[in-house]
Amino acid sequence: MTSTRVALVTGGTRGIGAAIVRRLAADGFAVFLSGRTEESTKSALAHFAKEGVSARGFAADARSEEDQKRLVQSVARDGGRLDVLVNNAGLGHFDRVDKLSADQFRETLETNLFGVFYAVHHAAPLMIKNGGGFIVNIASLASVNPFAGGSAYNASKFGLLGFSEAAMLDLRHDGIRMATVLPGSVDTEFGHSRRDASWMLAPEDVAEAVADLVRFPDRAIPSRIDLRPSKPPKK
C-alpha cells in the first residue's frame, strides 16, 4: 500500500472545491476530485495540469448513490487507499417557499444532504479497513442561520450539520474523525453577484481550514469550525 496520503474532494472542479484540491496537493496528498459531468471534470483537470497541480478525477453525480459508491471505490483502487474525504459538492435553489418547486427542493436536499450520506456510507468501510481517516463536510453558516428564500438550502445545511455531528459519534471509535466547516459568505460563482466582494471570504480561506483540520493530532477532533468574514458590511 502506498504511503502517500490520498484525498478525495467532491465538487472539486471550481470555487471552494478547487481551492481545496490545490491546497491538499501542495501539502503532498495524492488528490482526486469529482465533478458532476465528464465535461466539467475533464476541463478542471486540464486547468489544474496547466497550473502544475497534480490531480486525478471522476465524474459523479452527488444525487446518485451508485455514482458515489463507484467514485469512492475508484479512488481507493487507483490511489491504493482513501485517507481524507472532503464533501464539498453542493447547490442551492433560492425562492419563497410558496414559489419554490418540489423539484428544486428535492434537488437541493439530494445534492447537499443525501450526496454526503452516500459518500460517507461507502467511504467509511474503506477507511476502517485501512485503520481510519478524516472526513470534512463543507456546510455553511446557513446551517444555523435561517434566511428568507432559503427554505431548501437551510433545510439541507441544517440537516448536514446534524448528520455530521451524529455520524462523527458513530465513527470516531473506528479511527474516523469527522469535522464540519461552516463558512460565511465566500466570493465564488455560487452566490449572487455582488458589486463589492472585497469583504467576503476567499475560497482559499476555506481550503486553509480544511488543511488545518487534517493535520490535527489523531487524539483530537475539532468537530466544527465556524468561518466568518472579519469585516462584513455593517447593517
Name each model-derived stretch.
Residues V120, S156:
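Active-site helix of classical SDR
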Residues T13-R14:
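Conserved glycine-rich cofactor-binding loop
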Residues R96-V97, S101-R106:
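Substrate-binding pocket helix/loop in short-chain dehydrogenase/reductase
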